[in-house]
Amino acid sequence: MSAEPAVALRVPARALSITEEDFCAWLGRAMPRQRIEYHRGSLLIDRSKPLSPFSDKDRRELSAIANRAFVLAREGWLCLVQKRHGDFDYSYIAIIAARPDPAQRAQR
């Protein structure tokens, strides 16, 4: 009797939600509190070379998008959230942070 794994790590190949170029274009025009889903799946799996269902080119593109989002979040420009849909299925969402204007910052 062979035991089947409870959950398979492999997910069906998906297309990228957005390219890095389109993500950067959105960043340039988005207003505070606007949001975009920059990936649907599992960043842990989809960025991992041995596990990813994506081609090397798409996997590198996804990593570039995720890295850019993380850096901008760390600098306070974005808020990053996840919405869980199921096992290994998440929406990764970037939200433009509301930032006080320079006059408000000077008053602090």
Annotate each language-model stretch with its function.
Residues 2-59:
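Short amphipathic alpha-helical interface segments
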